[in-house]
């Protein structure tokens, strides 16, 4: 097999050299038509007409990266991996060659090289023995969770939100020793048939059944849990793009980013900058930002403790959690988009396939690298669902299509040059003036025998009060915000253009049933400064961070393109995006995101949207039915929520530590 693979690799190299010369000519570096689709030419990729070990133009990835990593780390994943050296053809970025070579199942078993600066956790031999039974690898940033009850997998991901620890460390510290979970008992009963390697037989059975009876929808019926750790806040948005998947991300509300993870603070170093003159400046700036953030956290916590003293009725745990959330909320704007996070994903094979196709078409190396690592791990758990992702004429063609469309639109948008004018943070740009009439007609549809158009004609003849009565009947008597009206509310929609800080956008982007699209993060729209920054005496430090990161982002954009420059931009800078949602989804988003415990940034956006639906669209009956939208302001917003959670824990016999 190795000899055949080596011959295949040699033939591919020769074919690629011929294709390279025919497409690009001697010494020409192909660049996408779209602005910054790849970025500036890499010095390491501009040798005249050469393809050295498949160093890709615009990205510089080597075919030997994975093999070298596997050779240096033969025990990196003892339970499923083999140290056998199989030539690994890394995915060509579609902007480089326009074709993505396939990856065999054997190649998928070779560990992917981790991102630059990835912090590898240290585990004892005993810990590794336990982890190897339940995780598809022990060392990498991307891994699957296997052989555990579904509720335990969900609980593991749930802990991500409030913990700085990795899921593997959480599993060892909080789950393994828990007698009620029986993890140790599960581990002792597992054999090779239960391990990921044992999937080979099931895969063969599945393929026989699929060939006879299956279609694409079969891939909706099997799923997997996968973790992506130490991922930047640019990557997390790419991971969480798809609607039909479930995500849980580490929260900036509950975690201080004032401690280093290994040798540096929790930020990603993009490969686009590796080995360039800007890498040192990037590291120095990021270190300075996190040091300032750490100093301001140290100032904010005691300030809020004195401003909001503990009440006798509150436990120390509730009070500390509330103070911590307040400090995190106010200072998160300092964190750059390069800040790393942990993300847990549960999705079907079909959802993963589409996610990987999008990621492989992305111009950022980090996103493509994680796609490569995810494909490796998913092929251990659900290999049959992901056979097409890297086939040149299937997934390769699909990813190339996505990339070419993006590049074409980038080029066309670059021709539009207009000055940016001041406008409100939230603008209602489109709605149906007859929306309430249509909702009233839709409310009758399921209970009637008439066609849709005849019901609409009938409702148009009714007095306004009768139409409002139909909408109120469709909404019903709601006891809380979880009592949502039915699908009649989907008959009308609202389209908002929003210009908010990146932190608020991150929270709203998680609403995936609506339609949301965003522009690149940059410094051109300015930044927001919460009122609390002046209260804790941090205005000068805040402004200095914003100015210094803007300088760095502008330099990265100049030499490496605006896509890579996003990493340097803090959460406080504003990003433009639109949200298009029907009234039923508006019930969910506006009532949830305006709750007292929410962040002030997105609470204001939700409140503005509600006012615009009521006043500008004139849909007063629908707006009135959204009775749990909260327009009040709060000083210590999280306190009541923490009290409610404490009461729930007490009712179940759980004491706060």
Model segments located where?
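Short, strongly patterned local motifs
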Residues: 1-102
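A conserved ligand/cofactor-binding region detector
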Residues: 97-99, 103-657
């Amino acid at each position: 097999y190795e000899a055949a693979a080596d011959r295949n690799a040699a033939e591919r190299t020769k074919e690629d050299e011929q294709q390279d010369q025919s497409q690009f000519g001697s010494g020409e570096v192909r660049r996408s038509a779209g602005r910054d689709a790849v970025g500036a030419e890499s010095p390491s990729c501009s040798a005249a007409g050469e393809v050295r070990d498949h160093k890709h133009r615009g990205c510089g990835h080597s075919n030997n990266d994975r093999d070298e990593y596997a050779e240096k780390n033969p025990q990196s994943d003892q339970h499923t991996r083999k140290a056998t050296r199989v030539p690994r053809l890394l995915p060509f970025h579609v902007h480089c060659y326009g074709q993505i070579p396939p990856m065999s199942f054997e190649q998928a078993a070779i560990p992917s090289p981790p991102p630059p600066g990835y912090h590898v956790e240290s585990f004892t031999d005993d810990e590794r023995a336990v982890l190897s039974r339940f995780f598809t690898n022990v060392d990498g940033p991307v891994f699957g969770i296997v052989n555990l009850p579904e509720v335990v997998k969900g609980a593991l991901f749930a802990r991500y939100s409030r913990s700085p620890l990795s899921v593997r460390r959480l599993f060892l510290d909080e789950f393994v020793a828990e007698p009620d979970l029986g993890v140790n008992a599960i581990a002792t009963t597992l054999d090779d048939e239960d391990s990921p390697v044992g999937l080979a037989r099931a895969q063969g059975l599945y393929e026989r059944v699929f060939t006879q009876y299956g279609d694409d929808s079969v891939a909706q019926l099997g799923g997997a849990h996968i973790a992506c750790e130490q991922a930047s806040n640019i990557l997390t948005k790419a991971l969480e793009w798809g609607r039909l998947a479930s995500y849980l991300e580490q929260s900036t509300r509950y975690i201080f980013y004032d401690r280093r993870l290994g040798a540096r603070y929790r930020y990603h170093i993009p490969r686009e900058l590796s080995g360039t003159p800007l890498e040192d400046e990037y590291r120095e700036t990021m270190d300075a930002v996190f040091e300032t953030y750490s100093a301001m956290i140290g100032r904010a916590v005691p300030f809020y403790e004195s401003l909001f003293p503990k009440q006798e009725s509150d436990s120390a745990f509730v009070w500390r959690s509330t103070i911590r959330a307040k400090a995190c909320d106010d200072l998160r704007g300092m964190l750059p988009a390069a800040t790393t996070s942990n993300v847990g994903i549960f999705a079907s094979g079909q959802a993963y396939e589409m996610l990987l196709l999008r990621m492989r078409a992305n111009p950022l190396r980090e996103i493509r690298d994680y796609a490569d690592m995810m494909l490796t791990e998913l092929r251990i758990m659900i290999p049959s669902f992901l056979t097409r992702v890297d086939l040149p004429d299937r997934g390769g063609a699909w990813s190339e299509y996505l990339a070419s469309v993006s590049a074409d639109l980038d080029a066309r948008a670059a021709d539009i040059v207009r000055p940016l004018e001041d406008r409100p943070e939230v603008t209602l740009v489109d709605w149906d003036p007859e929306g309430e009439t249509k909702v009233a007609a839709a409310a009758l549809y399921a209970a009637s025998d008439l066609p849709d158009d005849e019901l609409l004609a009938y409702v148009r003849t009714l007095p306004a009060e009768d139409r409002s009565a139909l909408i109120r009947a469709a909404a019903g008597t709601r006891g809380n915000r979880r009592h949502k009206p039915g699908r009649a509310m989907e008959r009308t929609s609202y389209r908002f253009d929003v210009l908010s800080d990146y932190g608020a956008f991150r929270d709203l982007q998680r609403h995936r049933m609506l339609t949301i699209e965003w522009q690149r993060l940059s410094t051109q729209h300015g930044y927001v400064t919460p009122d609390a920054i002046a209260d804790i005496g941090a205005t000068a430090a805040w402004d200095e961070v914003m100015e210094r990161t803007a300088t760095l982002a502008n330099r990265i954009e100049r030499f490496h393109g605006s896509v890579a420059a996003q990493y340097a931009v803090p959460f406080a800078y504003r990003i433009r995006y639109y949200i298009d949602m029907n009234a039923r989804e508006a019930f969910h988003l506006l009532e949830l995101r305006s709750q007292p415990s929410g962040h002030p940034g997105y609470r204001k956006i939700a409140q503005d949207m509600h006012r615009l639906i009521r006043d500008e669209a004139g849909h007063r009956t629908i707006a009135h039915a959204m009775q749990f939208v909260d327009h009040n302001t709060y000083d210590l917003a999280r306190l009541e929520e923490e009290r409610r959670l404490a009461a729930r824990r007490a009712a179940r016999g759980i004491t706060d530590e």
